[in-house]
């Protein structure tokens, strides 16, 4: 089991504006293991960006303890590192943002080289390093292009290369794909996954999109109004969300609400027979491999009319949603429900026949 590379314990962040006190982050504890791709999701104003800025102490917390890669960096209300040690620690933490923050008058390679200006490498070593970084992000052929000559995705690749210039152990992505189109977003996420695998890079993803969490992360924390309301593996959160906000994020990411709206307009649902019911089946892991609907027909003579089905792979484990009309004798449907529960399927009755 990997050890925690980032430990944020009981973090409070309070701002004072004139006569107002704003509690931006309230008693948040998050531990992120080495090699994680860890998502922090929430709407604007949830406190997620403010929280992650304490990792490299761009924002000092009001209270709490911060440990990064085994070193206590903040405790008892003050920074625990010398100025030199803090600078070195910050070199271990790269950041990328929604806005690429590239220098318009410098080429792609010059933008990456700028991050090495305080490095102890020789001029030749720096040049080789820049070439390697641009190759790593798939942009070596654009080394001499200026930002104005690059697409949004290419600019973000330059920003990623620059963030990796000092060989960080941690990469913080603050809404880094928000300004990109869906195709480019997928390409950037695929690149981040590749960097995670190749370099053992720990990635902290700040986003308001659960789809991104679903595509790339292995763990996720959900924030609301400065409070961490739910945290766990992506599989656990998607298959068994406990908080209303988490459920809202997930239904948006899976499209299940949109599917239900269309399903409810179908005649078979509008005029559901007395011996039928509309049900949502949620299942994960090994239960996706079993021919469960065939089994309940053979055992209980309960038919299943599939109106919607979707299976996705979350952290290498299949997770599925299905909306079906189950039809049969009342006692047989009850027995079929029980059998599905025993097989690890969550059954929600959406409507019963009249």
Curated annotation (Swiss-Prot):
EC number of the protein: 7.4.2.11
Binding site for ATP: 42-49
Cellular location(s): Cell membrane
Gene3D superfamilies: 3.30.70.260, P-loop containing nucleotide triphosphate hydrolases
Residue stretches making up the ABC transporter domain: 8-250
EC class: translocase
InterPro entries (UniProt xref): AAA+_ATPase, ABC_transporter-like_ATP-bd, ABC_transporter-like_CS, ACT-like_dom_sf, MetN_ABC, MetN_ABC_transporter-like, NIL_domain, P-loop_NTPase
GO cellular component: plasma membrane
Catalytic activity: L-methionine(out) + ATP + H2O = L-methionine(in) + ADP + phosphate + H(+); D-methionine(out) + ATP + H2O = D-methionine(in) + ADP + phosphate + H(+)
Membrane topology, from the record: Peripheral membrane protein
Pfam families linked: ABC_tran, NIL
GO molecular-function terms, A-Z: ABC-type D-methionine transporter activity; ATP binding; ATP hydrolysis activity
Keywords: Amino-acid transport, ATP-binding, Cell membrane, Membrane, Nucleotide-binding, Translocase, Transport
Keyword Ion transport: no
Role played: Part of the ABC transporter complex MetNIQ involved in methionine import. Responsible for energy coupling to the transport system.
The protein's assembly and partners: The complex is composed of two ATP-binding proteins (MetN), two transmembrane proteins (MetI) and a solute-binding protein (MetQ).
Homology family: Belongs to the ABC transporter superfamily. Methionine importer (TC 3.A.1.24) family.
Name this protein carries in UniProt: Methionine import ATP-binding protein MetN
Organism: Streptococcus pyogenes serotype M1
